[in-house]
Structure formats: structure tokens, C-alpha cells
Amino acid sequence: MKVFVHGWQHKISHTRILYSLRRFYHVETPFNQNIVSGRDLESTGFAWWSGNARLINVSGKLLGAHVAHAGIMVFWTGAMTLFEVAHFIPEKPLYEQGFILIPHLATLGWGVGPGGEIINIYPYFVVGILHLISSAVLGFGGLYHALIGPDTLEESFPFFGYDWRDKNKMTTILGIHLVLLGIGSFLLVIKALFFGGVYDTWAPGGGDVRLINNPTLNPAIIFGYVLKSPFGGDGWIVSVNNMEDLIGGHVWIGVVCIAGGIWHILTKPFAWARRAFVWSGEAYLSYSLGALSLMGLTASNYVWYNNTAYPSEFYGPTGPEASQAQAFTFLVRDQRLGANVASAQGPTGLGKYLMRSPSGEIIFGGETMRFWDLRAPWVEPLRGANGLDLNKIKNDIQPWQERRAAEYMTHAPLGSLNSVGGVATEINSVNYVSPRSWLTTSHFFLGFFLFIGHLWHAGRARAAAAGFEKGINRENEAVLSMRPLD
């Protein structure tokens, strides 16, 4: 049924202008302006699917959207943590159960015993409940600011109000964010130094929770990671391999963030910065997306390669670690059967169990030689001044090393391994889904699409600042050339 009322004539005319003469309409239900004031197409220029773009000039409602979004994220975290707690099986390692949140909590030293054994899941339950309670508070705050609170904050709460073009206010907000990030960094430092410590996979005997009493504060060491090459055995910041450096790095990050935050709060942007940057809401969005993209892509590499910040006891072995574990497992087996592992040759004439690396070190032989520079807690005790120590290989291998290598051998992050030494012969899900693979892939794709979003919004912001037409010309939208649905 078509409805036409003379009182709606101005709305219909406006719709024709905004969309197309070929648009159709059955019954139009006008928005309740008391509820969605400043968030409809007529008042903002953005349709509902443009999301927060409708709230560019209504700071109070934009605050509500952000607080509600935080509530959603915290709710997922709490609910998913409780889901993992409910499905926890003590007899199986975390990485075999597909968990991605409990491993993070275990890394912080909660509920963990020697060797990475989970001895108490109650702390994880508490963390999940606290996140659910927090999400309820955030959800209420989001609804309040979205529906009841003032449209803009400038009149009611000047401290929280802002103008996107106010460069001094924007850098002050940046400074506040940096201070909060610095405080967050110091929370980890405080936990590691004073409140129970953190899990250290390098602790003697196969890993344990310990206090980090002497974090590395030498700037040459900490910033040396940043200046390292990201290629080969250098590994940039991903190459950190001890908890002292990791916690010391957080000390420096906290200091730099807080100092930078105070600087931005107390100062105004220099003239060159005023000229170089675009100062608009969409520009700030693009900067944020670019920063998040860098974080996501860095985290992707960190999860995949680093077994210090992401212990293999919780996340499963790295690819090189699983390959080396297989070579080690077969070496132990054949040595017990009487094989001379120091001199045995494989079918290619190279060492079957042990061989020389390009730099002359003794390494595991076979196809796993490509991962000769792997460092892992279960194999490091067997090294000497020139690589693997033959005397230790023959006399000092401990049962926990054998068990861990055998477990890692069958849980490679890329899938099942064959007996050659490290080649993935089955897709990941045939054997099991590695949390290390899952987190690596998810962070890579999130980082990638955040980078695309950065380019998109940066282009729009620069075009708007230069006075170009921004967005798609609505006259050329594909949908306008299609037949009406009825």
C-alpha cells in the first residue's frame, strides 16, 4: 500500500534530492528527533551505515559510542575467559585446547606451577567475572551518554569538550593517552617486580614463575633491539630472549610514554607540525588506524617467532622449535639404540643427527638444519661454547627435555610433521589448531585491514583539507542505475 500525505511533501522532495527520482517509498516513519538528534542523514550528511561519522560534531554522543564499544570488547574478554575456564581440561596442555586468553593470564604468572603446569584456574574465573562487571559499567555509561547525556560536552564539561581544529587541545588529548599507556606499561613492571612475578620459560628445569629482580635498564641494550635488523638472525624487537630485557623494555616504554604525554600536555605543537599534519576528526582516525596496524603486524611476528613473551608451554611451539624438537627426539631414540649420533651420516652424506652450521657450530642434522639458530629453553642446556656439546648430548639429557620435545614435535603450528624433519605434510586442522597460528594469522589480517582503513581515511581527510570532493559521487552510485525492487 502506498501512502501519501501532503504534510510529508517536503520530506519526499528532500529524499529525491538526496537519492534519486527512481527511489521508491512505501511508508516513511519519521525519526524521533528527541532520541536521535544530530545523528540522521538530514542533520549530519551521513547515512546510518556511516557509523560514528554521524557523531563528528556531537562530542557527547561520540563519547557514548566509544564507551559502549569498550564495553563490548571487555564483555567479549570476560565471556570468552569464562568459556575457556568452563572447557578447561587439566590433563591437556593449553595449546591443545585452543585457548587464546588463559595463556595470556598464565604468562602473567597466575595459576601456574613449575614447567608451565596449570595448578589453579580460580584466578582465571575471577578475571573473567571482573571483566563482565566492568563491561556492565561501561555498557551503562555508553547507553547513558548515547541516549540521555548532553549532545556536546563543550558547554557542560569544558575539560572534556574539544574542537577537532583546536591543535593545542588535540595534542593535550594525545598526551593524556600517552600517560595512560605508560601507566599500563608500568602495571606489568609492578606485577613482575613485586606482585608474584611472571612466568619465565627460561627458568631452570623447564620454566617457572619468578620475580624479575634485575630488569635491564641499560638503554644501549633496550634500544639496541629497536635498531636491529628485522631480517635473518637479528630479529628486531622480536628477538628478545630473556625476561629481564622484556620487563626492562616495559620500564623504558612506560618512561617514554609518560614523559611524552606530559610534554604534549604542557606544550603546543610547533609550526612545522601545524603545517605538516591534517587537523580533523577523520585525520585523527587515520593516524590511530595506522598506529594500530603497526601494532597488529608487529604482534603477528612476535607471536609467530618469539617463545619468551609467548611461552611454548602455553601457545605451542614455534615452527622452528617443532622441527628441532623432532630431530632431537629421533636423536635420543637412536642414541639409546646404540647409534653413534656424532658420526652417523644421512642419505645425502650430511650428518644424520648432528652437523656443522655455516658458522661452524654443531647443530642438529637433517632437514631441520634450516632452523639451526633456534633458541629454546629445552635445548639451550645442551649447548656449549661451540654449539651443541657432544658430551652433554651423550650424558646430560633430562627426562623433561625428552618429554617436551616429543610433545612439541607433534604440535607444529603449521600442521603435522613427517619424519624427514620439519616439513608440514598435513594442513593445520588435521592435527590440531595451534593458538600460535591462530593469533599470528588474526593479528596479520587485522593489521592489514587496519592499514587499508588508514589509507582510506587518510585520503579522505587530505582531500577534505585540500577542498576536493570526498567520498563517492552519489549520482554515479551503481544502485541508482538498478531497477526499483517493486
Curated annotation (Swiss-Prot):
<keyword id="KW-0464">Manganese</keyword>
<dbReference type="GO" id="GO:0045156">
    <property type="term" value="F:electron transporter, transferring electrons within the cyclic electron transport pathway of photosynthesis activity"/>
</dbReference>
<dbReference type="GO" id="GO:0016168">
    <property type="term" value="F:chlorophyll binding"/>
</dbReference>
<keyword id="KW-0793">Thylakoid</keyword>
<dbReference type="GO" id="GO:0009772">
    <property type="term" value="P:photosynthetic electron transport in photosystem II"/>
</dbReference>
<feature type="transmembrane region" description="Helical">
    <location>
        <begin position="147"/>
        <end position="168"/>
    </location>
</feature>
<feature type="propeptide">
    <location>
        <begin position="1"/>
        <end position="28"/>
    </location>
</feature>
<comment type="similarity">
    <text>Belongs to the PsbB/PsbC family. PsbC subfamily.</text>
</comment>
<keyword id="KW-0148">Chlorophyll</keyword>
<keyword id="KW-0479">Metal-binding</keyword>
<feature type="transmembrane region" description="Helical">
    <location>
        <begin position="191"/>
        <end position="213"/>
    </location>
</feature>
<feature type="transmembrane region" description="Helical">
    <location>
        <begin position="460"/>
        <end position="484"/>
    </location>
</feature>
<dbReference type="InterPro" id="IPR036001">
    <property type="entry name" value="PS_II_antenna-like_sf"/>
</dbReference>
<feature type="binding site">
    <location>
        <position position="380"/>
    </location>
    <ligand>
        <name>[CaMn4O5] cluster</name>
    </ligand>
</feature>
<keyword id="KW-0602">Photosynthesis</keyword>
<dbReference type="InterPro" id="IPR000932">
    <property type="entry name" value="PS_antenna-like"/>
</dbReference>
<keyword id="KW-0812">Transmembrane</keyword>
<feature type="transmembrane region" description="Helical">
    <location>
        <begin position="82"/>
        <end position="106"/>
    </location>
</feature>
<dbReference type="Pfam" id="PF00421">
    <property type="entry name" value="PSII"/>
</dbReference>
<comment type="function">
    <text>One of the components of the core complex of photosystem II (PSII). It binds chlorophyll and helps catalyze the primary light-induced photochemical processes of PSII. PSII is a light-driven water:plastoquinone oxidoreductase, using light energy to abstract electrons from H(2)O, generating O(2) and a proton gradient subsequently used for ATP formation.</text>
</comment>
<keyword id="KW-0472">Membrane</keyword>
<feature type="transmembrane region" description="Helical">
    <location>
        <begin position="268"/>
        <end position="288"/>
    </location>
</feature>
<dbReference type="GO" id="GO:0046872">
    <property type="term" value="F:metal ion binding"/>
</dbReference>
<dbReference type="GO" id="GO:0009535">
    <property type="term" value="C:chloroplast thylakoid membrane"/>
</dbReference>
<keyword id="KW-0150">Chloroplast</keyword>
<keyword id="KW-0934">Plastid</keyword>
<comment type="subunit">
    <text>PSII is composed of 1 copy each of membrane proteins PsbA, PsbB, PsbC, PsbD, PsbE, PsbF, PsbH, PsbI, PsbJ, PsbK, PsbL, PsbM, PsbT, PsbX, PsbY, PsbZ, Psb30/Ycf12, at least 3 peripheral proteins of the oxygen-evolving complex and a large number of cofactors. It forms dimeric complexes.</text>
</comment>
<keyword id="KW-1133">Transmembrane helix</keyword>
<feature type="transmembrane region" description="Helical">
    <location>
        <begin position="304"/>
        <end position="325"/>
    </location>
</feature>
<dbReference type="InterPro" id="IPR005869">
    <property type="entry name" value="PSII_PsbC"/>
</dbReference>
<dbReference type="GO" id="GO:0009523">
    <property type="term" value="C:photosystem II"/>
</dbReference>
<keyword id="KW-0604">Photosystem II</keyword>
<keyword id="KW-0157">Chromophore</keyword>
<protein>
    <recommendedName>
        <fullName>Photosystem II CP43 reaction center protein</fullName>
    </recommendedName>
</protein>
<dbReference type="InterPro" id="IPR044900">
    <property type="entry name" value="PSII_PsbC_sf"/>
</dbReference>
